[in-house]
Amino acid sequence: MSNNETITNYTIKPHGGELINRVVEGNERERLIEEALKFKPITLNPWGISDLELIGIGGFSPLTGFMNKEDYTKVIEETHLSNGLVWSIPITLPVTESEAEKLEIGDDIALYGEDGQLYGTLKLEEKYTYDKEKEARLVYGTTEEAHPGVKKVYEKGNIYLGGPIKLLNRPKHDAFSNYHLDPSETRQLFHDLGWKTVVGFQTRNPVHRAHEYIQKSALEIVDGLLLNPLVGETKSDDIPADVRMESYEVILKNYYPEDRARLVIYPAAMRYAGPREAILHATVRKNYGCTHFIVGRDHAGVGDYYGTYEAQELITQFEDELGIQILKFEHAFYCEACGNMATAKTCPHDASQHLHLSGTKVREKLRNGESLPTKFSRPEVAEVLIKGLREK
């Protein structure tokens, strides 16, 4: 086994056994950028660009491009790719019917962002129609347009393009450049740190005491923690990524052992697909080199669309196939009678002793400049959030 293979497989093999790399560099990149000027162009929205990047860097291994109809259908109907691997969310490239009419099978297509930047190319293998309501129902569990993920599906063009991609330019994550590591780089990092077991934690929210309790409980049984916050597109009322990132820096610096935790961004859009998205999140963290993944209450949920532990129940069905160990945690809270953080598994007291704050209530307090109870949030974290939101 080569040294590169040793590092790639140090903690866990990527999904499908190979870490995909569709990033084009050097002379080939220069040549392709020049050639792409003659290709038919398509503009991708931020969601599409983040998917393109994750395919390119191997975060979505084993995908090498946007899904063809066979894979798409298998994924939405059976939660698997056509090759038999577990996959829960369709990764697709939508266009309008008028755009699709201009494209021929076999075309090389230039993929631009809304900023006018060329990000990559697609070799067009397939154009196909799809049923939006069916996709919404099977992937999101609802056809209601009030669901932010479903709304996105309904707003998309009516045709999907399938084919392999090449990644020529990367979206800029300048504000987070210190924390922008690709799966090959996190795997190298874990090797260098000597972490054989790593737990991944997905978040789009600040880390409050309940999250800290869960992360540290997991850290008791593994070598390291990968705090892997999503920094792509989220709902407008979610706390902005730059404010959240500062809060992560503060809590790691003050409350976590330096040699046991690392902060790395996950440059994806949030789909709010609940149980199905939990499976995707676990798959991606496996590709980043995590051996364990935390799934808590209402993982990747929104509103009241999913049951509290529905994501845990679904992912348990696929855990053996996924090959990453799922750590399932109940909702954590501060118990006045216990005098510490706890869950229903460890606390005998009734709800009157438990401190609960909903995400909505937390955001409301922060935007009003109100401090959060120290039993709920570390004061340094609350300070960063209040200051950050006041400046927005």
Swiss-Prot record:
Keyword ATP-binding applies: yes
GO BP term (any one): hydrogen sulfide biosynthetic process
Listed GO MF terms: ATP binding; sulfate adenylyltransferase (ATP) activity
Pathway where it operates: Sulfur metabolism; hydrogen sulfide biosynthesis; sulfite from sulfate: step 1/3
Originating gene: sat
Record Pfam families: ATP-sulfurylase, PUA_2
EC primary class: transferase
CDD domains named among the record's database cross-references: ATPS
Species this chain originates from: Staphylococcus epidermidis (strain ATCC 35984 / DSM 28319 / BCRC 17069 / CCUG 31568 / BM 3577 / RP62A)
Protein known as: Sulfate adenylyltransferase
Taxonomy, superkingdom: Bacteria
Upper classification of the organism: Bacteria, Bacillati, Bacillota, Bacilli, Bacillales
SUPFAM superfamilies attached to this UniProt entry: Nucleotidylyl transferase, PUA domain-like
E.C. no: 2.7.7.4
InterPro entries, per database record: ATP-Sase_PUA-like_dom (IPR025980), PUA-like_sf (IPR015947), Rossmann-like_a/b/a_fold (IPR014729), SO4_adenylyltransferase_pro (IPR020792), Sulfurylase_cat_dom (IPR024951), Sulphate_adenylyltransferase (IPR002650)
